[in-house]
């Protein structure tokens, strides 16, 4: 079974029913049913989104716990320095995390699943667009 590292936006879209890309993400996931990996960065993205949206902290943690309880879930610690994330092509601060996630996925011989076409344009074969 293929494992993909879900970026934060994919994780949010899969778990938040009223997210603009929820149906797209769920349809993509159900078609291929890959194993999805999360890491502290992507899990933090989900928690920040939920809490900023007004979800109580305990409820946000329960959502994350539900994701982590699935058979298709894999957790990857981000025990890797940013120095190994090749920042080639990075032109702005928002791309630094993308570079790190790609490096983490590559370390696990996998790719990043994303809704971000810019990430796919920059990292090509190291990423997969969710559509």
Task: Give each language-model segment a name.
Residues 1-38, 50-62:
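Short, well-structured N-terminal submotif of metal-dependent ribonuclease cores
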Residues 7, 38, 94-95, 116, ...:
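Histidine- and aromatic-rich ligand-binding microenvironments
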Residues 10, 42, 81, 118-119:
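Alpha-helix capping/helix-boundary segments
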Residues 32, 123-124:
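Short, structured coil segments at secondary-structure junctions
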Residues 70-117:
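Active-site neighborhoods of divalent-metal-dependent phosphate/nucleic-acid chemistry enzymes
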Residues 124-131:
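Active-site regions of enzymes building and remodeling cell-envelope glycoconjugates
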């Amino acid at each position: 079974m293929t494992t993909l590292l879900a970026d934060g936006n994919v994780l949010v879209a899969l778990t938040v029913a009223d997210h603009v890309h929820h149906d797209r993400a769920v349809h993509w996931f159900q078609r291929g049913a890959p194993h999805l990996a999360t890491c502290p960065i992507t899990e933090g993205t989900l928690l920040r989104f939920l809490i900023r949206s007004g979800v109580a902290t305990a409820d946000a943690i329960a959502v994350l716990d539900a994701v982590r309880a699935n058979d298709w879930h894999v957790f990857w610690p981000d025990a890797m320095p940013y120095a190994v994330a090749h920042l080639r092509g990075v032109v702005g601060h928002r791309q630094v995390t993308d570079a790190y996630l790609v490096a983490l996925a590559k370390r696990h011989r996998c790719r990043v699943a994303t809704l971000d076409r810019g990430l796919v344009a920059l990292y090509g074969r190291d990423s997969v667009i969710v559509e």
